[in-house]
Swiss-Prot record:
Source organism of the structure: Prochlorococcus marinus (strain AS9601)
Entries under PANTHER family matching the protein: NAD(P)H-QUINONE OXIDOREDUCTASE CHAIN 4, CHLOROPLASTIC, NADH-UBIQUINONE OXIDOREDUCTASE CHAIN 4
Lineage, broadest ranks: Bacteria, Bacillati, Cyanobacteriota, Cyanophyceae, Synechococcales
Gene: ndhD
Family, per entry: Belongs to the complex I subunit 4 family.
Protein name: NAD(P)H-quinone oxidoreductase chain 4
Signal peptide start and end residues: none
């Protein structure tokens, strides 16, 4: 009987359920009565988000083999055969950690949204639709379906910004949709080009595209378009300007979803498409990714240091930390690429915690200007402790997840011999500047908020209260995996190391083939990148 139950669980459509359950449940919300403060809707949304999280955990426990590098939990249903479109979902080591992260952060974001009283039905409807849509982005195995789910996620974010944002919410929401929807056209063009390549019958499945022998020029064209599209979402400097504006106007739960999940979609897509499906082009553009990663780290760290708005300071900090993802993806090292994956998970947790605290602090002080915040530590001691713990995690304190992921990226890049020694030394030295700046701007931020001379107007008028049990619980739920991963990173790395090794081997083979074909001859890349001995 137990064997039958186990077989049934392994055959259960876990991923389809985790995608369709929150989206389908969201359409129940309009039938809730409009009277009251939305208490029933909040509890319903929280229940659905928690069940979705349990479904994703069930998919990992019952159907996912961490030693298998291939796609698992595969579901393939013909949807629109004339267009070559199938409902194809699955998970490998690169997608499963992010699926779990998405459902986990969303459940906490629903709890963070407990104070929302304005249009609660629409708010939680959008959150649940966003939950299913973001899981779908990481789970789909069809490139055209990937484009559709990528676009589906944009609509809830736009509405959450435009309706519940700050005074400049319309500008921020419009800028977000122009940047992200506008750049998404490159995903559609690349999907159509790759799906129709060499055939009149389109096939958009990842497995088919990975087996295709795309020409070098074709790969380069697709790579550039996809780099722009995914670079907007990551974001890569100078395609980043929508993010500080979006974070500057968003509410705390939307902050958590933006920083915790949305940015990771860009990093995941770069791994899945640029590095995995276009290896020859990746061999040529990887040095550029390294340079862009270093620019992200330094530029965003310096800009964060200069910000006087708390939300924008943390937003630029996020951009800086995502630079390590770019370096890891371009490193051609199993350790470096593994570090990029871990950095996405780590920053998802840390970014969500910091932005939640930004929202909680604003709810009390009603200001985001650091010049108006000072001396509130005496009134909010628990809040100060929470801020300190999350800031230490963000500055990569040993024993926390950020330290491990950044160390893996640095070590993987510096010790790998694919790049020449001078290039590695210069890039690592420049990136280290950003690492040094991080504790400076974060610790100075803590000092300005919680220490110094008290602002009498702020203290007297706002009647500041300390952290509530709900807020402590949310931060505790985020800090637990942050510390757990920091102390024992194999909790996460074991789930994707087989897939990462397979990806890196594929890219190293592409470098060797490119060198034999003299692709780098006549360019300066051969002074940076050299063919490995495989």
């Amino acid at each position: 009987m137990l064997g039958t139950l186990g077989a049934g669980l392994s055959n259960f459509p876990w991923l389809s359920a985790s995608i369709l359950f929150p989206i389908g449940s969201a359409f129940v919300i309009p039938f809730f009565p409009d009277k009251g403060d939305g208490k029933e809707v909040r509890w319903f949304a929280l229940s659905i988000a928690l069940i979705t999280f349990l479904i994703t955990v069930g998919s990992y426990i019952n159907g996912f083999d961490i030693s298998n590098e291939n796609v698992q939990l595969k579901e393939n249903i013909s949807w629109l055969p004339d267009l070559g479109l199938t409902w194809s979902v699955g998970a490998d080591g690169m997608s499963m950690p992010l699926i779990l992260l998405t459902s986990f952060i969303t459940a906490l974001a629903v709890l963070a949204a407990w104070p929302v009283k304005f249009k609660p039905k629409l708010f939680f409807f959008l959150i649940l639709v966003m939950d299913g849509g973001q899981i779908a982005v990481f789970a789909v195995q069809d490139m055209l379906l990937f484009f559709l789910t990528w676009e589906l996620e944009l609509i809830p974010v736009y509405l959450l910004l435009a309706i519940w944002g700050g005074k400049n919410r319309q500008y921020a929401a419009t800028k977000f949709i122009i940047y992200t929807a506008g750049s998404s056209i490159f995903i559609l063009l690349a999907a159509l080009a790759m799906g129709f390549y060499g055939t009149e019958i389109p096939n958009f499945e990842f497995s088919h595209l990975a087996a295709q022998d795309f020409s070098q020029k074709f790969q380069i064209l697709c790579y550039v378009g996809l780099l722009i599209a995914f670079g907007v979402k990551l974001p890569i400097v100078p395609l980043h300007t929508w993010l500080p504006d979006a974070h500057g106007e968003a509410t705390a739960p939307v902050h958590m979803l933006l920083a915790g999940i949305l940015l990771k979609m860009g990093g995941y897509a770069l791994l899945r498409f640029n590095a995995q499906l276009l290896p020859v082009a990746h061999a040529q553009f990887a040095p550029l990714l390294i340079v862009l990663g270093v620019v992200n780290i330094i530029y965003a760290a310096l800009t964060s240091f200069a910000q006087r708005n708390l939300k924008r300071k943390i937003a630029y900090s996020s951009i800086s930390h995502m630079g390590f993802v770019l370096i890891g993806i371009g490193s051609f090292s199993s350790l470096g690429t593994s570090g990029a994956m871990l950095q996405m998970v780590s920053h998802g947790l840390i970014g969500a915690s910091l932005f939640f605290l930004v929202g909680a602090t604003y709810d009390r002080t009603k200001t985001l200007k650091l010049d108006e915040m000072s001396g509130v530590g005496q009134k909010m001691r628990i809040m100060f402790a929470l801020w300190t713990a999350c800031s230490l995690a963000s500055l990569a304190l040993p024993g926390m997840s950020g330290f491990v992921s950044e160390l893996m990226v640095f070590t993987g890049f510096v010790t790998d011999e694919v790049y020449t020694l001078p290039f590695r030394v210069v890039m690592a030295s420049l990136a280290a500047i950003g690492v040094i700046l991080t504790p400076i701007y974060l610790l100075s931020m803590l000092r300005e908020i919680f220490f110094g001379k008290e602002n009498p107007k702020l203290i007297e008028e706002r009647k500041l209260i300390d952290a509530e049990p709900r807020e402590v619980y949310i931060i505790a739920c985020l800090l637990l995996p942050i510390i757990g991963i920091g102390l024992y990173p194999r909790l996460v790395t074991e789930s994707y190391i087989a897939s990462i090794n397979n990806l890196v081997d594929r890219d190293l083979t592409a470098i060797k083939s490119a060198a034999k074909a003299n692709i780098f001859s006549g360019t300066k890349k051969n002074d940076i990148l050299k063919a490995p001995t495989i």
